[in-house]
């Protein structure tokens, strides 16, 4: 019988192993930049991915099959996810600060105009608008899946999650095509730097969110969630809505106002 409402974690090899694998990643990046060999970086990424899978597998077992995630543990997980999203807000705030700092008072080096001379901006009513529609629709579908889960509608939950994952993949494909069509690169001054840093990191978050939702899709298929206990699903939904909101700010500030 457990004496406290908190999960007292047992000894695990994963924290030590993941610290070693994470150490090899920046070392591999430095080695790649200096000598052009990418093998150490790929090794670190592969090893980190495997360890993360094994660690999260243990967490799923503890939560789903062993009942270690009590009400207090769930509250802590929700608070942790909320603080993580808050840190991500600060992360993107830095990119928006850099963009508006450069655009509201453009320097003489870029012609004192924004967008800078020589930059052909993307049409705001083409792929960017389609991307906005895709993400807004995905926000509707994940909300539909969440409501279906709380009401015990198994197949509706699966359908909503599957549709959201498809929209996430479609968004990434559109973003990749948009990058191939741009007439500027990340090396083309402050506009290219801020554009690709902000939209690129958002694309990375969409990729992570899509993987997060896919894991929840698999877990839903295997009946890991109930109408009252689905903190993993809730965390994925929060993260996806955060990605949606960030894109709206990107679309309004960079694609529409910045053009």
Swiss-Prot record:
GO molecular function per UniProt: cytochrome-c oxidase activity
Keywords per UniProt: Membrane, Mitochondrion, Mitochondrion inner membrane, Translocase, Transmembrane, Transmembrane helix
Catalytic activity: 4 Fe(II)-[cytochrome c] + O2 + 8 H(+)(in) = 4 Fe(III)-[cytochrome c] + 2 H2O + 4 H(+)(out)
UniProt-recorded name of the protein: Cytochrome c oxidase subunit 3
Membrane topology: Multi-pass membrane protein
Function, as annotated: Component of the cytochrome c oxidase, the last enzyme in the mitochondrial electron transport chain which drives oxidative phosphorylation. The respiratory chain contains 3 multisubunit complexes succinate dehydrogenase (complex II, CII), ubiquinol-cytochrome c oxidoreductase (cytochrome b-c1 complex, complex III, CIII) and cytochrome c oxidase (complex IV, CIV), that cooperate to transfer electrons derived from NADH and succinate to molecular oxygen, creating an electrochemical gradient over the inner membrane that drives transmembrane transport and the ATP synthase.
Subunit structure: Component of the cytochrome c oxidase (complex IV, CIV), a multisubunit enzyme composed of a catalytic core of 3 subunits and several supernumerary subunits. The complex exists as a monomer or a dimer and forms supercomplexes (SCs) in the inner mitochondrial membrane with ubiquinol-cytochrome c oxidoreductase (cytochrome b-c1 complex, complex III, CIII).
Cross-referenced InterPro entries: Cyt_c/ubiquinol_Oxase_su3, Cyt_c_oxase_su3_dom, Cyt_c_oxidase-like_su3, Cyt_c_oxidase_su3-like_sf, Cyt_c_oxidase_su3_a-hlx
Main EC class the enzyme belongs to: translocase
Subcellular location: Mitochondrion inner membrane
Protein's GO biological process: mitochondrial electron transport, cytochrome c to oxygen
Gene Ontology CC annotations of this record: mitochondrial inner membrane
